[in-house]
């Protein structure tokens, strides 16, 4: 049904965009209508860039409105972008990973074409010695006790899953 589709897309956009509230129904409805047309390429809604390529729909966070100005202390939990819990066992400063190439997306992956857009939205930790630490990405459920799910890695980034709850 249309209402179910709108709610589903709204939750995805809310989670990816890091917003407290979902976008308005009318805007999501217009987005879903446009997806059914053959001329859809790219739209933005709720800080999310929605792209259609071949048989895939991609929801990628826009780089703007991201706050990287965090001084990270050892084993202290931070909320990054309203959707990630961040914890580190080394002190440092949070920086944008725009110039860092993760090279962990294989060329045959559907995400390969958008790897630069994805990398720009993932934070990186610059230690006090100047070393760059890539995050360990994980997903936790919002309903579970997050303290049990979060382990102290060198630099952990935990996505708070709001889509399936």
Please describe what each predicted stretch is.
Residues 1-165:
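AMP-forming adenylation/ATP pyrophosphatase catalytic core
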């Amino acid at each position: 049904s249309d209402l179910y589709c709108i709610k589903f897309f709204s939750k995805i956009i809310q989670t990816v965009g890091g917003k407290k509230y979902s976008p308005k129904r009318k805007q999501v409805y217009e987005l879903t209508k446009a997806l059914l047309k053959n001329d859809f390429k790219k739209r933005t809604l709720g800080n999310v860039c929605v792209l259609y390529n071949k048989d895939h729909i991609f929801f990628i966070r826009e780089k703007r409105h991201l706050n990287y100005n965090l001084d990270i202390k050892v084993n202290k939990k931070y909320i990054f972008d309203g959707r990630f819990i961040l914890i580190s066992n080394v002190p440092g400063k949070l920086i944008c990973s725009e110039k860092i190439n993760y090279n962990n997306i294989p060329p045959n992956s559907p995400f390969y074409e958008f790897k630069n857009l994805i990398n720009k939205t993932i934070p990186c930790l610059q230690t006090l010695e100047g070393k760059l630490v890539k995050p360990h990405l994980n997903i936790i459920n919002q309903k579970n006790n997050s303290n049990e799910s979060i382990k102290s890695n060198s630099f952990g980034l935990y996505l708070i899953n709001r889509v399936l709850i």
